Amino acid sequence: MKNVPKIWTVAELTREIGQTLNDNPDFVNCWVSGEISNYKNHRPSGHWYFTLKDEQSSMKGVMFRSRAERVRFTPQDGMKVLVRGSIRIYERDGTIQLYAEEMQPSGVGALYLAFEQLKERLGQEGLFAPERKKAIPRYPRRIGIVTSPTGAAIKDILKVMFRRNPQISWILAPAAVQGELAPKEVAQAIARLNRHSQVDVIIVGRGGGSLEELWAFNTEEVARAIAASGIPVISAVGHETDVTIADMVADLRAPTPSAAAELAVPVWRELKSDLEQLEARLHSTMSSQLQRKRQRLDSLKTIGPLSNPFWRIDQNRQRLDSLSERVEQGMTRFVSDKNGILKLLTAKLDLLSPLAILGRGYSLTYGPKGNVLRKSDDINVGQQVQVRLQQGILTCAVLAKSVDSD
């Protein structure tokens, strides 16, 4: 009897292949080299999806957000990389997929590549442009310092500051300067000094170290905090040969923390000398101005109104007399005009006055109730009426009445 071949379902076969891959240590935590293509940073999950290929084959890959956040550079299509991860089956599609744990550029360090990528991007935004850099104040009253409170940098900075000016005031905004928390703490310290506005210039830096130890000052978070600062920033990171992104964004770069203190704090003796020179210049300027004013006064005494102090008084008296005469003439004309208007109005009132009408021979007749009689029907025969003349009143009795035929 022949052996009956086993018939697999697609799901069973996929799971079996996946288990075989999982059981093979060569496919767990292995390194794969290839070229990135179809790279996509999925939003909002933050997972990376890509294809890893060479001249003969290709394989899909995924790096989840928790791992992708640790990669110092941004993958790009065409970039050759080394990827560490595990080979597994994506059961839904039945495809082999690389689940990446780590990624580094092939042939160049990951930190160097990240540095160059950020440098190019910020440069295109204009963050390194000379015209956006702020001037460092010549006579700062208080210095802000962003560094570790226990490192060598703070000691070097304070030593130089007090040597140059024992009276200088300073504020330390403590921050970690290496490690995963360093970028956030440095950026927050810069923002805090800006928020309180108690310093005139900020020194940001640390002592020397490896590229990894200095990396906080090559991050975008610190670079943007420096760029956003309304207070001038002096960067002082590492040794003279170390150049960071923070140095490029800062308003002034110092090769060391000690040099930053030299640039920020003027020497007390030089400051005193500058004040003495300013005092001398002020005295000279005031003396010159006073001398010119005296010469001008002397000139006015001989050729101007001051040569005769009563000259201006006489001029004003004549002007006052002229104005008084003009006011008097104006008032006379005003009164005359008003008298004429008054006479005209009086004449018009006389024409309308009832007394004036009576003066021309007319009279007013009032009935028993004091009402003015306008027609004969308003009174009866035998009733008394009062007749108002221009001068005097007559009391009369009505003997008869008639109506005009008109």
Swiss-Prot record:
> Keyword set for this entry?
Cytoplasm, Exonuclease, Hydrolase, Nuclease
| Compartment list | Cytoplasm
The protein's matches in CDD domains, at most eight in alphabetical order, are given as: ExoVII_LU_OBF
Q: Supply the InterPro entries for this chain.
A: Exonuc_VII_L (IPR003753), Exonuc_VII_lsu_C (IPR020579), OB-fold_nuc-bd_dom (IPR025824)
Which EC number applies?
A: 3.1.11.6
Superkingdom to which the source organism belongs:
Bacteria
Segments forming a coiled coil: none
Q: Does the record carry Hydrolase as a key word?
A: yes
Q: Which reaction does it catalyse?
A: Exonucleolytic cleavage in either 5'- to 3'- or 3'- to 5'-direction to yield nucleoside 5'-phosphates
User: What terms describe the molecular function in GO for this protein?
Assistant: exodeoxyribonuclease VII activity; nucleic acid binding
User: Per its UniProt entry, what is the enzyme's top EC class, as one word?
Assistant: hydrolase
Report if keyword Cytoplasm is assigned: yes
Predominant location category:
cytoplasm
A Gene Ontology term for the protein's cellular component: exodeoxyribonuclease VII complex
- Give the protein family: Belongs to the XseA family.
Q: Can you state the subunit structure given in the record?
A: Heterooligomer composed of large and small subunits.
Q: What does this protein do?
A: Bidirectionally degrades single-stranded DNA into large acid-insoluble oligonucleotides, which are then degraded further into small acid-soluble oligonucleotides.
UniProt-listed NCBIfam families: xseA
Please report the name of this protein according to its UniProt entry: Exodeoxyribonuclease 7 large subunit
Gene this protein is translated from? xseA
